[in-house]
Amino acid sequence: MTQNSQETVIGRITSVFGVKGWLKVFSYTDPKDGILNYRDWTLLLDGKRIPIRLEEGRRQGQGIVVRLKGIDDREVARTYCGAEIRVPTEQLPELPEGEFYWHQLEGLDVFTVEGECLGKVHHLLETGSNDVLVVHATAGSIDQRERLIPYLPDQVVQQVDLKGSRMVVDWDPEF
């Protein structure tokens, strides 16, 4: 999930499904069908914001399919393909202490326990065993390398300071 201002991206429309205007959705929520808990969406497509309501949805194989209010034709549905699905950030459930949404980690400065700047969290990857921080170099980092750092709280990630916009990791900069 990524955040823009007071909205968080929770998925994207990938393609049409069937002939009655249903759409396939790639969900960024965990679990995947958690996206169906949000009824009022804002779609962002080609720079345009489109408020729309989720009428119904369900799991279909490994993915999610949805029907949006006012869309009951395959060709009309096709015009929404590629849209980001956004919801107000305030609607996201509060997480337990020490847990974070990905959008909260994106943009944090990353430092080693020795105080060396490795860069800034650009985005995260889901690998199956654990999430991975993709850290891009910044003007203040020790070099210009991109780093992939496992997001393992208490093992690799020692501290997350959202207010200070920084993260401390136990990570060898040479790795």
From Swiss-Prot:
**Keywords noted in UniProt:** Chaperone, Cytoplasm, Ribosome biogenesis, rRNA processing
- Coiled-coil stretches, from where to where? none
Annotated GO molecular function terms are: ribosome binding
**PRC barrel domain: which residues?**
97-175
Q: Does the keyword Chaperone apply?
A: yes
Gene3D superfamilies linked: PRC-barrel domain, RimM
UniProt cross-references to InterPro entries, sorted A to Z: PRC-brl_dom (IPR027275), PRC_barrel-like_sf (IPR011033), RimM (IPR011961), RimM_N (IPR002676), RimM_N_sf (IPR036976), Transl_B-barrel_sf (IPR009000)
Chaperone found in the keyword field = yes
Listed under GO biological process in this entry are: ribosomal small subunit biogenesis; rRNA processing
| Localisation per UniProt entry | Cytoplasm
Q: What Gene Ontology cellular-component terms does the record carry?
A: cytoplasm; ribosome
Q: Which NCBIfam families match?
A: 16S_RimM
Q: How does it assemble?
A: Binds ribosomal protein uS19.
Q: Which family does it belong to?
A: Belongs to the RimM family.
Q: What is known of its domains?
A: The PRC barrel domain binds ribosomal protein uS19.
Q: What does this protein do?
A: An accessory protein needed during the final step in the assembly of 30S ribosomal subunit, possibly for assembly of the head region. Essential for efficient processing of 16S rRNA. May be needed both before and after RbfA during the maturation of 16S rRNA. It has affinity for free ribosomal 30S subunits but not for 70S ribosomes.
Q: What is this protein called?
A: Ribosome maturation factor RimM
- What is the organism of origin for this protein? Marinobacter nauticus (strain ATCC 700491 / DSM 11845 / VT8)
